[in-house]
Amino acid sequence: MNKEDKINIDLFKVVTRAIGESYDLGIMTNHLTQLLVGALGIKACTMFALNFDTRELEILASFGLSLAYLNKGPVLADKSVRDVFKGEPIVIEDVTKTDQIQYPKQALQEGIKSMVSVPIKLYGQALGVLRLYHSEPWDVSKRDLDSLEILAENIGLAMMYTRLLNTIQSIRETINELPGDIAPLLKT
């Protein structure tokens, strides 16, 4: 694929609205992975959250990959496109010519020829990874890479927002479950 811009302002608006209008992280990430695959004409997209304890990338949402590929084994942050955690997007134009892929054999069997990994960051800390897969060599334009970085930062904000919202809802439910004479005291 040549180096042409795929992300225009209309696509960026649709994607940004999908992020801003969702209160559910699972629905939002599933919608975004499907939207990106269709709009960019790529093979697949996966969003991962970093488990800080195990250093594994846990799948938030994925579209376009087989169950066999998704279940190939744990995706370790230090072995799978590890340089993305230095804070910059990584473009792998040919998966056969890199040592950054943890499961190269499975990637080839899946029909993956190239991939782009973009850190999902909040306040400079990586929370996860937005990963896009293509079935042919992919030379991503600088403008599209910049757009994907901004998108990933918005996803980071949305992840934090939905976690905060879920925490507040959980606290509200806990307060409402308290005995009748205690709950009103906490609401004032």
Can you annotate each of these PLM segments?
Residues 93-114, 134:
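Signal-transducing coupling segments at domain and membrane junctions
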Residues 16-20, 32-41, 49, 108, ...:
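Short regulatory alpha-helical segment in sensory/regulatory domains of signaling proteins that mediates
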Residues 1-27, 168-184:
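Signal-transmission linkers at sensory-effector interfaces
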Residues 149-157:
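Allosteric cytosolic regulatory segments
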Residues 34, 46-70:
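GAF sensory/regulatory domain recognition
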Residues 58-60, 67-102:
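Regulatory sensory and allosteric helical modules in signal-transduction proteins
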Residues 129-138:
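Short beta-strand-to-loop transition segments that serve as allosteric relay/switch motifs
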Residues 113-121:
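A short, aliphatic-rich beta-strand micro-motif
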